[in-house]
Curated annotation (Swiss-Prot):
Keywords: Cytoplasm, Glycosyltransferase, Purine salvage, Transferase
Disulfide bridges in this chain: none
The protein's name in its UniProt record: Adenine phosphoribosyltransferase
Family: Belongs to the purine/pyrimidine phosphoribosyltransferase family.
Species this chain originates from: Campylobacter fetus subsp. fetus (strain 82-40)
């Protein structure tokens, strides 16, 4: 599977805005809306992801709420694949299956429709989100996919906040690809 050159990574990273002290003091938020609003950069990113995954014989793209929906749905349209959302609790209207995960203080949960992959036996799936930090949501999502019996080919992120260790943690569950590592 293909990766970007250092020059191309610098180009994409330059289209992402840093917001200091958001959502709380001490945090530098990676705002991808500036990349999404730049038609050339967004197309470049999608061209790269399409090229990386076009020969993987995937059946579905799974996107993690909420910015994973943007990237995942766009990529699924490019690859002519179905898109399946991973949602926060009580957001899906049909019967769901869930996976809890730990937060610094407490727990959270992700859900999917229980029949999301019923149309294909042992589907090959790509998990997509905009960013991986500590990896809690991504790991819970990968565990949820395993409960549903899918073949998780890879988890793909636009940005990996490497020092927070999420991608390293997730590699115990599945292969991980990050377009940009910061």
């Amino acid at each position: 599977m293909k990766e970007l050159s250092k020059f191309d990574k610098e180009y994409l990273l330059g289209t992402i805005r840093d917001i200091k002290n958001f959502p709380k003091p001490g945090i530098i938020f990676k705002d991808i809306t500036t990349l999404l609003g730049n038609a050339k950069a967004f197309k470049f990113l999608l061209d790269h992801l399409e090229d990386r995954y076009k020969d993987e014989n995937l059946d579905f793209i799974v996107g993690i709420e909420s910015r994973g929906f943007i990237l995942g749905a766009a990529l699924s349209a490019r690859l002519n694949l179905g898109f399946v959302p991973v949602r926060k609790p009580n957001k899906l209207p049909y019967i769901t299956i869930s996976q809890k995960y730990s937060l610094e203080y407490g727990f959270d949960e992700v859900e999917m429709h229980i029949d999301a992959f019923d149309s294909i036996k042992n589907p090959k799936v790509l998990l997509v989100d905009d960013l991986i930090a500590t990896g809690g949501t991504a790991k819970a999502s990968s565990q949820l996919l395993k409960k549903l019996g899918v073949n998780l080919v890879e988890a793909c992120f636009l940005v990996d906040l490497v020092e927070l260790g999420g991608s390293k943690e997730l590699k115990s569950e599945c292969p991980v690809y990050s377009v940009l590592e910061v």
